[in-house]
């Protein structure tokens, strides 16, 4: 069954698509916090993201990376369903799901689109969870125009930098 549904929004046609129609849906790996350093150094140059919200999920730095330019979301705990774009190379712990797309869809704009709806799919029975199979089936409205997504992403990134400067 095709979940595409075209609508007219702004100047472009946007489509309703399932996350797994756009992204490879995967997960990070276990990493002991003791193997990370709080600051970059010669050996540990890649950011490590976890499920925490402190420092935008930054746990520390590590010598290896698993992903590059991808979207993460918190799978378990109080912050389950929190979605972020991670630019550059990074390591993601096992309490994060990861969305991978090599064609430009992994960006700030799409992470915000998903973040606006992901909370609705968090299972709140016991420990809150948003598992890979559930994330994969979430429907989002998205433009197929990568240039439009890049422009929206630039605005979001500039806005985020402005907020960071004034905190």
Kindly label every feature range from the protein language model.
Residues 10-13, 97-104, 120-121, 128-150, ...:
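Proline-centric
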Residues 115-118, 160:
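Short amphipathic alpha-helical signal-transduction/dimerization elements
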Residues 37-38:
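Conserved, non-catalytic sequence blocks in retroelement Pol enzymes and Pol-derived host proteins
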Residues 1-31, 43-46, 52, 152-167:
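Conserved aromatic/hydrophobic "specificity hotspots" at molecular recognition or selectivity sites
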């Amino acid at each position: 069954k095709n979940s595409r549904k075209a609508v007219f929004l702004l100047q472009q046609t946007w489509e309703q698509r399932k996350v797994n129609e756009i992204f490879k849906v995967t997960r990070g790996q276990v990493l002991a916090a003791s193997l990370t350093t709080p600051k970059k150094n010669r050996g540990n140059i890649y950011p490590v993201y976890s499920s925490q919200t402190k420092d935008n999920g930054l746990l520390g730095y590590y010598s290896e990376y698993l992903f590059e330019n991808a979207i993460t979301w918190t799978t378990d705990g109080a912050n389950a369903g929190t979605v972020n774009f991670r630019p550059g190379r990074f390591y993601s712990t096992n309490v994060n799901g990861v969305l991978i797309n090599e064609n430009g869809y992994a960006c700030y704009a799409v992470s915000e689109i998903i973040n606006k709806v992901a909370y609705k799919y968090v299972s709140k029975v016991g420990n809150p969870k948003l598992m890979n199979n559930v994330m994969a089936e979430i429907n989002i409205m998205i433009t197929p125009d990568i240039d439009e997504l890049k422009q929206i992403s630039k605005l979001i990134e500039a806005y985020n930098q402005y907020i960071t400067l004034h905190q």
